[in-house]
Swiss-Prot record:
It comes from the Bacteria. InterPro entries: I/U_nuclsd_hydro_CS, Inosine/uridine_hydrolase_dom, IUNH, Pyrim_hydro_RihA, Ribo_hydro-like. The lineage of its organism: Bacteria, Pseudomonadati, Pseudomonadota, Gammaproteobacteria, Alteromonadales. Its EC number is 3.2.-.-. This is Pyrimidine-specific ribonucleoside hydrolase RihA. GO terms for cellular component: cytosol. It holds the Pfam family IU_nuc_hydro. The keyword Hydrolase applies. One of its GO terms (molecular function) is uridine nucleosidase activity. Coiled coil: none annotated. The active site is at H240. Transmembrane segments: none annotated. It comes from Shewanella sp. (strain MR-7). One of its GO terms (biological process) is nucleobase-containing small molecule interconversion.
Length: 318
């Protein structure tokens, strides 16, 4: 039985790869793709989702744009990481179809309402759309099985010393999500910084004889540029967002622990910090399964094997 999911993203190189990974596996049933501002401006992230789905010949999946800014803050973007288009590197096709007339929140609500099984939400950008959905459609909470998100860190941040980018962009939205009572899997920097793709892995991907793998290799070529800065201490580039999909496909690849997680929304120094109570110091009930470790080679093998699925026959099956 396939698991119904909705991907809420801000493509973004690693968002695009997460989407490509998800659509290689029939055990995941993408009901919709929604977008928000984050890695680039809202018009660009929406276009990028359409471009990736066009590459995959999946115009059957409805797409809607969502929040153009955080709940109560000014928008910031990560164009220094993802380039002018948000997906700099490969020559992607122009979108072959249009987004839905409704916004992201209403598309998500419609798909959750219509689904005969509880839906898993997979946000890989700022949590604004998810927070708006939860705030405006309380009647649908029981139909959301889990939220598997990329964001946060138990340790250091990557946008400030304390905060990871997705949470820092809209900490008030993250606060709503983590207080919702819906089961959460948190794929934070603790695990995603271990999910590094190396030069030799990119060459494995480049050797796969299909256009989707070629596109991913070229996305990674560009993504590597930012992460080669000595300050990070990386050998490769961390594939943050695909960790969400990898966990859905094979949670045995990960080490996890149930923790209470709170979001800092006020401090000047630690705004956007995910406060992870790994040692139950607060006595508060756990609200998230936090990923701390990963089988990196197993993760890379999953990605490589998934990209090999995109043969001409697979791409033209619909």
């Amino acid at each position: 039985m396939s698991r119904p999911i909705i991907l809420d993203c801000d493509p973004g190189h690693d968002d695009a790869i997460a989407l490509i990974l998800a659509l290689a596996h029939p055990e995941l049933n993408p009901l919709a793709v929604t977008t928000s501002a984050g890695n680039q401006t809202p018009d660009k992230t929406l276009k990028n989702a359409l471009r990736i789905l066009t590459l995959l010949n999946r115009s059957d999946i409805p797409v809607a744009g969502g929040a153009v800014k955080p709940l109560s803050r000014e928008l910031m973007i990560a164009d220094n990481v993802h380039g002018e288009t948000g997906l700099d590197g490969p020559a992607l096709p122009a979108p072959s179809f249009q987004p839905q007339a409704v916004n992201a929140v209403e598309l998500m609500a419609e798909k959750i309402r219509q689904s005969d099984k509880p839906v898993t939400l997979v946000p890989t950008g700022p949590l604004t759309n998810i927070a708006l959905l939860l705030a405006s459609h309380g009647e649908l909470h029981a139909k959301i099985e889990r939220i598997v998100l990329m964001g946060g860190a138990a340790g250091v941040g990557n946008w400030t010393p304390a905060a990871e980018f997705n949470i820092f962009v809209d900490p008030e939205a993250a606060d709503i999500v983590f207080k919702s009572g819906i089961p959460i899997t948190m794929c934070g920097l603790d695990v995603t910084h271990q999910a590094q793709i190396m030069d030799e892995d990119i060459e494995r991907i480049r050797a796969i004889p299909n256009p989707v793998a070629k596109c991913v290799a070229e996305l990674l070529d560009f993504f590597m540029i930012y992460h080669r800065a000595p300050k990070w201490g990386f050998v490769g580039a961390p594939l943050h967002d695909p960790c969400t999909i990898a966990w859905l496909l094979n949670p045995a690849l990960f080490d996890a622990q149930d923790c209470w997680v709170g979001i800092e929304t006020q401090s000047e120094l630690t705004l956007g910090m995910t406060v992870v109570d790994r040692y139950q110091l607060t006595g508060k009930p756990t609200n998230a399964t936090v990923l701390f470790g990963i089988d990196r080679q197993g993760f890379v093998d999953l990605l490589v094997d998934s990209l090999a699925v995109y043969t001409p026959t697979y791409l033209n099956r619909r």
